[in-house]
């Protein structure tokens, strides 16, 4: 069953807010901007993560220098799952942030 438009937007909004909170509470030197539903996280080394919503597909997209990743929400687990690799969003972010910033953050709740 596909997510309703309202549920999809609520989930993406909550996910982006949780990401902002987590990054704000970290010791990382970064800048964030959330504009028109797109969350951009810029690290001090120039790399960035871009989170955007793809409403027609009901997906959360992540752009990183290593590529683009499309996540579907799994109602059973309550997690975003990459359609290509089946990796959880939180697991992928832990790896990417470690590679980009050298800090381990806990994205288990994402």
UniProtKB/Swiss-Prot annotation:
Tell me the Gene Ontology biological-process terms attached to this UniProt entry: iron-sulfur cluster assembly
UniProt entry keywords in alphabetical sequence: Iron, Metal-binding
Q: Is-annotated flag, keyword Transcription?
A: no
| Annotated GO MF terms | ferric iron binding; ferrous iron binding
Q: Which SUPFAM superfamilies match?
A: Frataxin/Nqo15-like
Q: Does the keyword Nucleotide-binding apply?
A: no
The organism's superkingdom is given as: Bacteria
- What PROSITE patterns does the annotation carry? FRATAXIN_1, FRATAXIN_2
For this record, the Gene Ontology CC terms, alphabetical, are: cytosol
NCBIfam families named in the record:
FeS_CyaY
Q: What does this protein do?
A: Involved in iron-sulfur (Fe-S) cluster assembly. May act as a regulator of Fe-S biogenesis.
Family under the similarity heading: Belongs to the frataxin family.
Annotated protein name in UniProt: Iron-sulfur cluster assembly protein CyaY
Q: Which organism is it from?
A: Pseudomonas entomophila (strain L48)
The gene that this protein is the product of is: cyaY
């Amino acid at each position: 069953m596909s997510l309703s438009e309202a549920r999809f937007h609520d989930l993406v909004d909550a996910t982006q807010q949780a990401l902002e909170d987590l990054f704000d509470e970290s010791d990382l030197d970064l800048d964030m901007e959330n504009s028109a539903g797109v969350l951009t996280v810029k690290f001090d080394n120039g790399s960035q993560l871009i989170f955007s919503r793809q409403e027609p597909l009901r997906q959360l997209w992540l752009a990183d220098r290593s590529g683009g990743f499309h996540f579907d929400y799994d109602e059973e687990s309550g997690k975003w799952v990459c359609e290509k690799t089946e990796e959880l969003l939180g697991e992928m972010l832990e790896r990417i942030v470690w590679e980009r910033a050298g800090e381990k953050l806990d994205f288990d709740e994402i």
